[in-house]
Amino acid sequence: MPEGSVLAVRDRRKASIWTIVHPIFAIGQMFAFFVSVGYFVAYLRGAVSYDAVHASVLVKIALMVGAVLTGSFWERDVFGYWWFAPEFLIEDVMTLIVFMFQLAYLGVVAFHRDNMPAVLLMLGIAYAVYAINVAQYIHRTQRQKQETQAAEKMLGIAA
């Protein structure tokens, strides 16, 4: 099987421990995102303090760091690159953009916490960029699964 074929990638994906570990962080991060958005909306309605919102964002960012680290190990095992594998370039670039906005939010909080409109605007932008990243990631994952299934079907291989 050629090294870059869909089935070779599938085999490397199945052989990597990071295929199991990475989704724990990715799903945890997504869950933390939804919780954080809930806190954000509750804050806007006056139901929770800003500190609760900020704490939920910090948890989400910590899980994102875990997802990025485990994702880089996974990418190395599957594609041979720690970061920016040609097959995963869009996802890696989007992740960097998401990180930039998360860090921008933390910067606004650190230096302008008393300017709540600026803090909330930056948080809203960070949430939107993260949501776009999640959508493209889900799309890519589904497309990759379909390509693998098509290759397996064509070669008569059971999953």
Predicted regions and their residues:
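Cytosolic juxtamembrane amphipathic/interface segments immediately preceding
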Residues: 6-19
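Hydrophobic cores of alpha-helical transmembrane segments in multi-pass integral membrane proteins
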Residues: 21-44, 50-78, 87-111, 115-142
